């Protein structure tokens, strides 16, 4: 069982398409992003109110520097690419008022996976606060998912 929140959720999704041990029967992700580049572009726009120009070329330059320094482009850090290879059951959880990792990203992630999947949007929850805002509903969704797919 893999379970992650925020960056941990993105990490869980990024491992989903790998050759994981058979003990990993299912994955739960809570508010993970689609890929690093999309998240940085979103933050530049929302936090810094940066317009498309110069945001686009700056993120591309940053991606190139990242490639030189650590060996990969920002787009390579992609949950979506790994989810295309996933065949394990997944529960996707996201806050409906998430401004840090926009809620729209969960729909892209959800559509990308090949395994059995469930989606729960915690309507009024901001980033990483679905459990804090809806503890009973959160527990119910997780418990039902685990009962279905993890024996």
Language model regions located:
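Acidic catalytic loop of the alpha/beta-hydrolase fold
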Residues: 96-101, 128-129
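Active-site nucleophile elbow and catalytic-triad environment of alpha/beta-hydrolase enzymes
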Residues: 65-82, 88
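Catalytic active-site module of serine/aspartate enzymes centered on a nucleophile-bearing elbow/loop
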Residues: 133-151
């Amino acid at each position: 069982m893999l379970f992650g929140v925020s960056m941990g959720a993105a990490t869980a999704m990024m491992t989903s398409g790998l050759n994981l041990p058979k003990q990993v029967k299912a994955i739960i992700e809570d508010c993970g992003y689609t890929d690093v580049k999309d998240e940085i572009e979103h933050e530049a726009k929302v936090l810094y109110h940066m317009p498309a120009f110069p945001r686009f070329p700056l993120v591309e330059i940053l991606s190139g520097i990242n490639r030189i320094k650590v060996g990969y482009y920002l787009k390579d850090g992609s949950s979506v690419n790994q989810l295309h290879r996933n065949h394990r059951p997944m529960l996707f959880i996201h806050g409906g008022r998430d401004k840090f990792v926009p809620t729209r990203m969960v729909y892209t992630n959800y559509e990308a996976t090949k395994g059995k999947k469930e989606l729960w949007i915690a309507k009024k929850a901001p980033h990483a606060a679905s459990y804090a805002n809806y503890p009973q509903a959160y527990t119910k969704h997780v418990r039902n998912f685990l009962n279905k797919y993890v024996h």
